[in-house]
Amino acid sequence: MVEIANAHNDLIHDAVLDYYGKKLATCSSDKTIKIFEVEGESHKLVDTLVGHEGPVWRVDWAHPKFGTILASCSYDGKVIIWKEENDRWSQIAVHAVHTASVNSVQWAPHEYGALLLAASSDGKVSVVEFKENGTATPLIFDAHAIGVNAASWAPATVEGGNNPGEAPKEVRRFVTGGADNLVKIWRYNPETQSYLVEDTLEGHSDWVRDVAWSPSVLLRSYIASVSQDRTCNIWTQEDNTGPWVKTQLTPEEFPDVLWRASWSLSGNILAISGGDNKVTLWKENLNGKWESAGEVNQ
């Protein structure tokens, strides 16, 4: 475990390792992003990225096939794309289509290209496609009327292609969580070149603070949603087409607001953090029941 002490002058909101686990990006209410090189349990600060005018909520690394690229989102309503070349970091794009805080940012599975998903307190979600010629094409649309707190891509999947002469079709989906207490599943329609609501999931009685789609590419899909109401729901769907089934984790385990949910790389362990300053781990047993798998020692 790498411990970063006194790196920022205010609260740290996110910390993400790159694809290889060699670089760590952190972001803070001090309006900066810090880049560290990580080796074993040691780390070295290599750069401080300055460009946002408000607290920076989240950061996300692009797949290395696109280069050493990082996206950040902030209370200032902007998403900034940063790139490292020759050991120097610089801004290469600013995505400023939102009119309020951008609360979540995530790159799509690399199979879809350089697609970036952003969620904002203005009630809208945007998906930006960055093309090789340097242009960017944004789609922006209403998602949750009171505000969107989080968004998460589904892993890359295809459907069809089972019959002779039939090509498999790419399935692009993501999930959003909002201040309207709802979780929504979105699916890309290539004919209209737009994202449409596929399902609306009701299961929380207060703001949905985070959503996380498991990266597992099994036939069953898993989504975790955590809320201001102190609950975590696991939503499951069989084979991309069936109804979503809700399982609520043991409620007495969570004495305070839940802020974040994060899956392991294999998609079988879920980490949840909340207002009690604990990170708890959860795993599905062979009987399909979710049980505690311990805590992360701080």
Swiss-Prot record:
**What subcellular compartments does it reside in?**
Cytoplasmic vesicle, COPII-coated vesicle membrane; Endoplasmic reticulum membrane; Nucleus, Nuclear pore complex
What GO cellular component is one of the record's annotations? Answer: Seh1-associated complex
The UniProt entry's GO biological process terms, in alphabetical order, are: COPII-coated vesicle budding; ERAD pathway; mRNA transport; nuclear pore localization; positive regulation of DNA-templated transcription; positive regulation of ER to Golgi vesicle-mediated transport; positive regulation of protein exit from endoplasmic reticulum; positive regulation of TORC1 signaling
Q: Which SMART domains match?
A: WD40
Please state the protein's primary subcellular location: membrane
SUPFAM superfamilies linked: WD40 repeat-like (SSF50978)
List, in alphabetical order, the Gene Ontology terms for molecular function in this entry. structural molecule activity
Protein's membrane topology: Peripheral membrane protein
Give the keywords, sorted: Cytoplasmic vesicle, Endoplasmic reticulum, ER-Golgi transport, Membrane, mRNA transport, Nuclear pore complex, Nucleus, Protein transport, Repeat, Translocation, Transport, WD repeat
Q: Does the keyword Nucleus apply?
A: yes
InterPro entries xref list? Sec13/Seh1_fam, WD40/YVTN_repeat-like_dom_sf, WD40_repeat_dom_sf, WD40_rpt
Q: Which residues form the signal peptide?
A: none
Annotated function: Component of the coat protein complex II (COPII) which promotes the formation of transport vesicles from the endoplasmic reticulum (ER). The coat has two main functions, the physical deformation of the endoplasmic reticulum membrane into vesicles and the selection of cargo molecules. It also functions as a component of the nuclear pore complex (NPC). NPC components, collectively referred to as nucleoporins (NUPs), can play the role of both NPC structural components and of docking or interaction partners for transiently associated nuclear transport factors.
The record's comment on protein family reads:
Belongs to the WD repeat SEC13 family.
Tell me how this protein assembles: The COPII coat is composed of at least 5 proteins: the SEC23/24 complex, the SEC13/31 complex, and the protein SAR1. Component of the nuclear pore complex (NPC). NPC constitutes the exclusive means of nucleocytoplasmic transport. NPCs allow the passive diffusion of ions and small molecules and the active, nuclear transport receptor-mediated bidirectional transport of macromolecules such as proteins, RNAs, ribonucleoparticles (RNPs), and ribosomal subunits across the nuclear envelope. Due to its 8-fold rotational symmetry, all subunits are present with 8 copies or multiples thereof.
Q: What is this protein called?
A: Protein transport protein SEC13-1
